[in-house]
A protein has these predicted regions:
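Extended catalytic cores of very large enzyme megasubunits
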Residues: 1-427
């Protein structure tokens, strides 16, 4: 290579001539056993160098140069870019390419408030030594470029403001395993930790985002999704919104069972007021979901569930579509429609489905989930009761609307509540 003339700004502020031979060695190392051209990456990167360039920017330029060469004809550039990205990531996290000892790493980041202090209390120094010896840091080099960017952007512990990363992927996998099995019997837990670590680090199983990004941090978020049962009172509705904010900030996805909320026009306090219906409260939930991100990893997300026989179902099914106005749409949540055998039978037999406000038929709502025979008996009983507000709609028409909105939005889910309860491990 030609004698360099450009100056490089080091991390401590010093300037020195650019070392193109060092850059060549790094790219050659990353290109080992790959069908790529080292010189092509060098040429593509060098035209972007400038006098006074920082060393971190040189690394970023090399990564981008390799990533720009990824194509169907030359897919190996995705692994070259990934290896360069891992090299850069480790330099930022550890100040060097070689990762530190697991115990030293956890101690340092616990002192900085990045890791859960329980890690140091739950495991002995001897256990840390055994787990450190089991780490296979070479697996960091098996990722494709897109995977490294996903890890860097979402999953690795970092300062979400400055974007400084504090760990490498193998530490992520090992520490998640250590947190999940911390309270298993001491005599056997290391075998569980190691089996889990090897399974996730070799991509045999995958983990949900909240577990990967939060389980080893002080927030101690062990659940990826949280289900919230919403009642029909203002206290319950506001408690639901409060729980949404708390758990979204803790990185959890949200499921809201909002089927108990009474329909629009229902009496409140024996007719003292008239109910505004589900939609204003769904908007309240949407605001709660979107007011914080999932621990800085991604925006909050929620799915709201309601029964197909809810009196407002025709208005609820269209909440996500692009027609209508903001007042009658709640587009930034997903929806789950709850069905059972009775609903399907009405469809097959080309009969009507009768809609009720759950507040008017509370025992019907409870039986919908708990006792299908009881539900069928009560459903027929309330259909014949002239004192209860209701609306009959052809089952074919209602199912048609549901499937049309499901096809158009792709974000309306179907929950067969009777099937769920007979095939679930939960009581």
């Amino acid at each position: 290579m030609n004698t360099p003339t450009l100056l490089v700004t080091k991390r401590d502020g010093r300037q020195e001539p650019i070392d193109l031979e060092k850059i060549h060695r790094v790219i050659t190392w990353a290109a080992q056993d790959l069908n790529v051209s080292v010189s092509q990456v060098e040429l593509k990167a060098r035209i972007q160098f400038y006098d006074g360039i920082r060393t971190a920017d040189i690394h970023s330029t090399l990564i981008k140069a390799a990533a720009d060469l990824i194509s169907l004809e030359f897919p190996d550039y995705q692994y070259l870019a990934a290896r360069l990205a891992i090299f850069h990531l480790r330099k930022i996290a550890f100040g060097q390419y070689e990762p530190p000892h697991l115990f030293n790493h956890v101690t340092r980041l616990t002192e900085q408030g990045k890791y859960d202090a329980h890690l140091l209390r739950d495991y002995t120094a001897d256990e840390f030594e055994q787990l450190n010896q089991a780490l296979v840091h070479e697996r960091d080099l098996c990722f494709a470029y897109a995977a490294v960017k996903q890890l860097e952007g979402k999953y690795l512990v970092q300062d979400r403001v400055t974007k400084k990363v504090f760990e490498s992927p193998q530490f992520l996998y090992m520490l998640v395993a250590m947190c999940l099995f911390a309270h298993y019997p001491a005599a056997t837990r290391l075998s569980y930790v190691l089996r889990f670590y090897h399974a996730v680090s070799t991509f045999k199983i995958s983990l949900p985002t909240p577990i990967m990004s939060g389980v080893r941090t002080p927030s101690r978020q062990f659940s990826s999704c949280v289900l919230i049962e919403c009642g029909d009172s203002l206290d319950s509705i506001n408690a639901t919104a409060s729980a949404i904010v708390k758990y979204v900030s803790q990185r959890a996805g949200i499921g809201i069972n909002a089927g108990r909320i009474r329909a629009i026009g229902s009496p409140i306090r024996n007719g003292e007021a008239q109910h505004t219906g589900c939609i204003p409260f769904y908007k309240h939930f949407q605001t709660a979901v979107k007011c914080c991100s999932q621990g800085g990893v991604r925006g909050g997300a929620a799915t709201v569930f309601y029964p197909l026989w809810h009196l407002e179902v025709e208005s609820l099914l269209v909440l996500k579509n692009n027609r209508g106005v903001e007042e009658n749409r709640v587009r930034h949540m997903d929806y789950g429609v709850q069905l059972n055998k009775t609903m399907y039978q009405r469809l097959i037999q080309n009969q009507d489905i009768t809609l009720f406000s759950p507040h008017d038929v509370p025992d019907l709502y409870e039986a919908f989930f708990a006792d299908q025979a009881r539900f069928e008996q009560l459903y027929a009983q309330y259909e014949a009761d002239p004192s209860i507000r209701k609306k009959a709609i052809p089952a074919l028409e209602l199912f048609g609307l549901m499937m049309q909105e499901r096809a158009n939005t792709g974000r309306i889910y179907i929950q067969n509540v009777d099937h769920c309860n007979t095939h679930s491990p939960f009581n």
